[in-house]
Amino acid sequence: MKEFKSFYKEVKGNEGSKCLYNKRLDTYGCGCQHDCSYCYAKSLLDFRKLWNAKTPAVASLDRIEKKIERLPVGTVVRLGGMTDCFQPIEKQERVTRGTIMLLNKYGIHYLIVTKSDLIVEYMDILDKELAHIQISTTWIPAEKAVSTERRIQAIETLYDAGFDVSVRLSPYIPQYVDFERLNSIRCNKIIVEFLRVNHWIRKWLPLDYSEYTLKQSGYCHLPLVKKIEYLAMVTGFEELSVCEDVDAHYLYWKDIVNHNKEDCCNLRMKEE
């Protein structure tokens, strides 16, 4: 199995300036077995022949520990920034499980972003003060991740157990959402991220892109007025936030919409 050596990154630029948690740790890289048609990481790596969905590279736990032990206590690390840390390969490699145990050991917060319900099997090691979980819900056809219903069940299981968990509607494509089911999920928090489109995503994902008329940083986006219209269809959550890439839209959500104006991920953080 090929080793994934560039497992840690501090995100810079446009994305890094907007995201409060720009430290990213990927336990698997250069491919993801979910192989989503709308994945921006895939769109960046596939044309360079660096994307291998069937056999992702695997990070070394020894190298991961050397990085984690140097991080200040209270740091928040995002698990699953470029690839899903709970993709099927985790069942055999268990690098994510080992990484979580190391993060617990060194007192490092971790933000898990996943499309898998495998995380429920790890509830025995998740630290309720350090673990922050976002499970992505999508109803896009032919996805290779587990069914949306299984993901919803995982959200509700974690929520009922008292974990800091959010529904992550990412990407939010209204044409592919079961709003009745979405708005009935037993969870108090949701994070919405609208689709951003480039050439490769147009090629892979069948969709009417005529509304994606706003261009920024190499991507096409919905205009703000359309985003506001579609966001009104998301109801039933006490705390709503929008994860945004477009500069002017980011300021609008921050000032007008987001539950936590300083943290669009809206993590439940205790005072250190």
Predicted segments with their positions:
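Conserved AdoMet/S-adenosylmethionine-binding subsite of the radical SAM
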Residues: 64-231
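C-terminal accessory extensions appended to soluble enzyme cores
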Residues: 198-272
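Short linear sequence elements within intrinsically disordered, low-complexity coil regions
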Residues: 43, 177, 255-258
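The N-terminal extracellular segments of secreted preproproteins, especially immediately downstream
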Residues: 18, 31, 186, 263-264
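Pocket-edge structural micro-motifs
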Residues: 29, 40, 80-81, 135, ...
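N-terminal [4Fe-4S]-dependent radical SAM core
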Residues: 1-67, 72-76
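A broad, structural surface signal
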Residues: 34-37, 101, 233
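Compositionally biased, intrinsically disordered low-complexity regions enriched in proline and serine
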Residues: 9, 39-41, 123, 160, ...
